[in-house]
Each structure stands twice: as structure tokens, then as C-alpha cells.
Amino acid sequence: MPSLLITALFLNVIIYVINTVGAATVDGLLWLLYIQLPTGTSQIAREQRHMKREVVQLKHEMSSTSSQDEFAKWAKLRRRHDKALEAYEAKNNELTQSKSTFDITIKIARWAATSGLMLFLQFWYSKTPIFTLPPGWIPWQVQWVLSFPRAPMGTVSIQIWSGACATVVALVGDAMKASLAYVSKPKIDRIKLGATMEGKEGKKRQ
């Protein structure tokens, strides 16, 4: 069943990427994308940013105004600042509540679309072979393991295929990370060496 074979592989790749990047990072990126959409939450986010800039500006004006020499102006700025700060905190709390709801929703959706879907496929297609092995190719004991738990004898079950995909994806991913680290390390070493040489030359000039 090629479509099921590819689906299981694709899901394992997605799960590995999410685990490597970090679920919190993925959620943060999705939140940034979400508040760019034309929704009520994006309107709240824009208002919150505008209020924050206003509070910072008023605070800067207060700092540059003497409370002794220009008390009337300073007091007026203080009242405006306090009022703007109160409005900002209320809007920020509203945005925080929206983000909490979004985080819960996205966690459920992410699990359902990855691990939840994988569990469903393993249950629903437990009797469906991913592919059939050539007759007599391997001993029957190995065939039994590959068909575990409910696939026909002489085939590979989705559980075994999914486990194999997860292992291979993890190995390939770790190899890629190690290769990138190895390639980038000489550059970092050259930068450190250059900084050390410049420091030594500077000391010699002194």
C-alpha cells in the first residue's frame, strides 16, 4: 500500500522535525503567523503594540521633563502615562488570554495531526500489509516479527514500518546535524583564531 507507506514516513519526518526544533518554537511561529491574519486577535495584537509604543513615548517625555521646573506639564504627562499604562495592561491581559487559548488549541491540533494520526493509522490498518516480502526470503520467525501484531504472515505491518521509519529518520537527522556542526566548526575556529591574533597584535603595539 504505497500511500500508507509514504504517509507513515512523512508523519515520522514531521514528528522528528517538531521534536528537533522544539514544540514551543513551532507554537511561537504559528502564533506570529496567526496574528497576521485578519482576525479579532490580530486586531487586539495591533492595538496592544500601539498602546505599548504610546506608553514608552509618554514615559520618555516624562523623563525629559523636570518635575520641579515644569510641574504642570509633568503632572499632565503623568496622568496620561498612567491612563495609557492601565489601558495597555488591560489590552495585554486580553491578548495573553487569547494566546493561552491558541496554545491549547494548537497543541491539541498538532498532536492530532501527528502522533494522534499515527496511532489511528496503526490501529485502523493493523491488518493491512505495507508491502509483501518475497516467499522464502527470510525465516518464518523473522516474518512473524515483521508482520506483528496483526498483518498477514510474510508481510510488513504498519507498526514495524513506522518504527523503522522513525529509526532511520532519527539516524539521518542526527547525521545531518553532525555534518553541519563539523562544517561550521572550522569557521568558528577561524573567527576565534583571528580574534586572538588581533588581541596579541594589539598588546604588542601597546
Curated annotation (Swiss-Prot):
Gene3D superfamilies: Helix hairpin bin (1.10.287.660). InterPro entries: Get1, Get1_fungi, Helix_hairpin_bin_sf. Pfam families: CHD5 (PF04420). The chain crosses the membrane at residues 5-24, 111-131, 156-172. Residues 1-4, 132-155 are lumenal. Its main location: endoplasmic reticulum. It is found in: Endoplasmic reticulum membrane. The keyword Flavoprotein does not apply. One of its GO terms (molecular function) is protein-membrane adaptor activity. Interacts with GET3. Belongs to the WRB/GET1 family. This is Protein GET1. It comes from Ajellomyces capsulatus (strain H143) (Darling's disease fungus).
